[in-house]
UniProtKB/Swiss-Prot annotation:
This is Protease 1. It comes from Achromobacter lyticus. Disulfide bonds join C211-C421, C217-C285, C241-C263. The keyword Transit peptide does not apply. Its main location: secreted.
Amino acid sequence: MKRICGSLLLLGLSISAALAAPASRPAAFDYANLSSVDKVALRTMPAVDVAKAKAEDLQRDKRGDIPRFALAIDVDMTPQNSGAWEYTADGQFAVWRQRVRSEKALSLNFGFTDYYMPAGGRLLVYPATQAPAGDRGLISQYDASNNNSARQLWTAVVPGAEAVIEAVIPRDKVGEFKLRLTKVNHDYVGFGPLARRLAAASGEKGVSGSCNIDVVCPEGDGRRDIIRAVGAYSKSGTLACTGSLVNNTANDRKMYFLTAHHCGMGTASTAASIVVYWNYQNSTCRAPNTPASGANGDGSMSQTQSGSTVKATYATSDFTLLELNNAANPAFNLFWAGWDRRDQNYPGAIAIHHPNVAEKRISNSTSPTSFVAWGGGAGTTHLNVQWQPSGGVTEPGSSGSPIYSPEKRVLGQLHGGPSSCSATGTNRSDQYGRVFTSWTGGGAAASRLSDWLDPASTGAQFIDGLDSGGGTPNTPPVANFTSTTSGLTATFTDSSTDSDGSIASRSWNFGDGSTSTATNPSKTYAAAGTYTVTLTVTDNGGATNTKTGSVTVSGGPGAQTYTNDTDVAIPDNATVESPITVSGRTGNGSATTPIQVTIYHTYKSDLKVDLVAPDGTVYNLHNRTGGSAHNIIQTFTKDLSSEAAQRAPGSCG
């Protein structure tokens, strides 16, 4: 009977697979009987007045309005009054298509104010020029998971002036399908790198200032996790800001997205129109203050998410908290940032944002924050952050982006400020509505953060971030290094490994107050002695690991230090060895040879440590003394003058 049940189960799976919609690409690529794209009904939009829009934008900029990149064109298009239906050759699917064109648009996006997709169906939006072997990242797909109580769907941008809207529906469910297109949004600025390339010929580019710093640059090292929390987004297909996923005390990965109240997302209709662009960042580090940094980037806008509901909003501290409609896509590898609601200032701050809603950038401040009211007057609702001359700034489009403490916790979201690449002195600063103020907000769940970010009322003052629950967890790297010395100079070789990625950055501390980020640095010490050296490595997933070792340098002629920094575990009642290879020496050892020993162990009185030469001579260093004290971190001096160079000490056991 088990075999029979198995056969029935396989049959059921086979039927289910046969009724699933085709792959996420235009149906005509898989069904030759469907009309070619050039035969699909075309609707051309009325001309838009771009000159008027740009004149309006000058006034919008003066008022500090959030950036506009598109003009909305009102339409009323449904499958009942537009486009045409066809059936796939196998008779299983009905396919409805409509081409839409708006002359000179740099990109298009669409607002559907009545959307319902039955199970097994899908909606595609793609460039009219899409080819079977073309970039699949330009195709946006929506299905039943995008159904929502507002019955709205707003799409990601499609580069170019002409796009195809395509619905593929199981034939027996066509009656359930609902679609009403009411907004065609004409991009006249250049939203995204592909649209900006189309704009380049006319000199229009929606790029950010050259002083900004790409998140892939070294300034992002150690912050790779919080970088993944930040996304750019569009509102109603025409305006744009920045926001961030935030964690809550339940650690349940609710899709809470924090942004600015002034971005206008505080109503049900505008919240439903959000389209978030995740991991939209340049692939290389463009040196700040170079032409490349101020030019078009290469960030991908293929990782998108549509729709949300409002949880809370409060004008005084300029926050809006949304809950995005859909769970995180594991492939996006998102991060939920922690937060800090304490009533205090901080010694510095970090901003991650989308200036001009272009590729993601990072700004750093090493100046203490201060309390201000919005606009810079006396008050405590906002944090004032002073940017360094070379630490990046924010720009229009950065609004709503998070400001982080040095511990990588959200302290607030960007309200605004005078900062820009050309700003100097105190004008190179910004103001952020504080999480502290927003926590109690206006005194009700709809105007404060506490109900949502601390649902069980734990009273937590701060929490750390939470990584994605999907995909393959990032395995932390293993830090390791070796060293050699010559006189007062030590040369270090990084031998760290990362099993599921690569080492992205290194931070050395040489034990005398000096540091380095080089891969294999050399260090010349001012005086002879033994120094504790630490290496902290960060992998490409943001995980870190630290290795601590020691190095002994001597000012004497020809002095050389040999080490073995490989960690060795010490089991109970066991003998272990840590071999040290000595080569390239002549003559005998010194009568005052220093031997640095570093052993981390509870109760040093349990330990016996010997130095054993290759000829078997044993030099005792430590013999079960020290009582209840822990660890042996000590330099011993031994007379090794009887040891010839080729018979130098071989191991420490």
